[in-house]
Design a protein with these regions (language model features):
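Loop-helix junctions at membrane interfaces
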Residues: 1-164
Length: 164
């Protein structure tokens, strides 16, 4: 069981790396498709697994971009893990709409709040539209894919969460 879960975590992390390489230019930086595999993992494998994939996915996306924000990416990875974890918990409770809306809003408006203090309000304001677009795209892709992939994942794996 552990080796199967580890293999699935590696698979979703690899999907996250592929998504991180697909970038759409945005106002500040770019929008990547690195989060939707984490949302898939959170819904299919459990919130702990999704959190791991979310943190790794962001770090891989930052690595591909050359870590433009330096050590701030560690904070962002932790934020991403937390947001994906909350998404997974709510999704598991069959609150899919709440999970999706909360993820989009928190990833867009709450996660970049530290940048107000580190950079300035102008940087935060410039970042928000890009994050909103990216969050919506990643969440919609995940919501479309989850029901289709649920039939492919064996029932003994579904929501057998990873302990953090």
């Amino acid at each position: 069981m552990k080796s199967r879960m580890l293999s699935l975590l590696a698979l979703f992390s690899a999907l996250s790396a592929v998504g991180a390489a697909i970038k759409i230019p945005a106002i500040v930086g770019s929008v990547a498709f690195d989060v939707f595999p984490a949302l898939l993992a959170a819904a299919l494998l459990g919130s702990g697994a999704g959190a791991i994939v979310g943190a790794l996915g962001h770090l891989l996306s930052a690595l591909i971009s050359g870590f433009p924000l330096g050590p701030m990416h560690l904070l962002i990875a932790i934020e991403m893990a937390l947001l994906v974890y909350i998404f997974g918990v709510l999704y598991k409770k069959n609150k899919k709409g709440t999970a999706s809306i909360l993820f989009v809003l928190a990833n867009t408006f709450a996660a970049p709040l530290p940048f107000i203090f580190i950079m300035n309000i102008a940087f935060y304001t410039a970042l928000v539209p890009s994050l909103l677009i990216g969050s919506i795209i990643n969440t919609v892709i995940a919501l479309v894919a989850i029901p289709r992939l649920r039939t492919l994942v064996k029932p003994d794996i579904l929501n057998h969460d990873v302990k953090l």
